[in-house]
Amino acid sequence: MQTVNQTATKVLTETVTAIPHRRVGILGGTFNPPHLGHLIMAQQVGDQLGLDEVRFMPDAQPPHVDEKKTIAVEDRANMVQEAIVDNPLFRLETAEIERGGKSYTYETMKFLKAKHPDTQYYFIIGGDMVDYLHTWYHIDELVKLVTFVGIKRTGYPTTSQYPVIWVDAPLIDISSTQIRQKISHGHSVRYLVPEAVAAYIKEHHLYEQND
């Protein structure tokens, strides 16, 4: 026969066990600037995997990008916020901005898991990047912290030595480099970036000089 305390303990344990972990997608990038391709990818992953939210995580100082072509992280974060403000699935993740310095995914995800140990993270990358996972910093430790989500790309295999969930999403041939070049030449970027992002770029005179 169980005592009241034993019964209460059992109920509490079962309740705690039944609490589902939050399932959060992470889309990292320079977002220089964010464009509709980013939003479509994030929406498709969130919907298909049933995630609680998808967070856009701007790099503070990208390890593999020419710093001369990367505008201030504050502007990039502000543009992300403008791009996602009307979508309840999306959030801005500032972990790499808070940490500062060069952004390595392993260090950032270790930081996030320490803050939110009960959150299950899904790290979203293009299918063209999956082949290069073996070159990522501390990849063997990183795969213990996150589940990788690969966006299928034509011409790239859907296999990997690492665990990857593959997702189909519309292929939108938009690049931030292309957008910067168009702006620097005075061309329209309508339908390439959200209207709020285009307005922010114009207001702050971003990318007006040639790359």
From Swiss-Prot:
InterPro entries: Cyt_trans-like, NadD/NMNAT, Rossmann-like_a/b/a_fold. Pathway: Cofactor biosynthesis; NAD(+) biosynthesis; deamido-NAD(+) from nicotinate D-ribonucleotide: step 1/1. GO terms for molecular function: ATP binding; nicotinate-nucleotide adenylyltransferase activity. SUPFAM superfamilies: Nucleotidylyl transferase. Its EC number is 2.7.7.18. It catalyses: nicotinate beta-D-ribonucleotide + ATP + H(+) = deamido-NAD(+) + diphosphate. Keywords: ATP-binding, NAD, Nucleotide-binding, Nucleotidyltransferase, Pyridine nucleotide biosynthesis, Transferase. GO terms for biological process: NAD biosynthetic process. Gene3D superfamilies: HUPs. It comes from the Bacteria. PANTHER family: NICOTINATE-NUCLEOTIDE ADENYLYLTRANSFERASE-RELATED (PTHR39321), PHOSPHOPANTETHEINE ADENYLYLTRANSFERASE (PTHR39321:SF3). Catalyzes the reversible adenylation of nicotinate mononucleotide (NaMN) to nicotinic acid adenine dinucleotide (NaAD). HAMAP family: NaMN_adenylyltr. Belongs to the NadD family. This is Probable nicotinate-nucleotide adenylyltransferase.
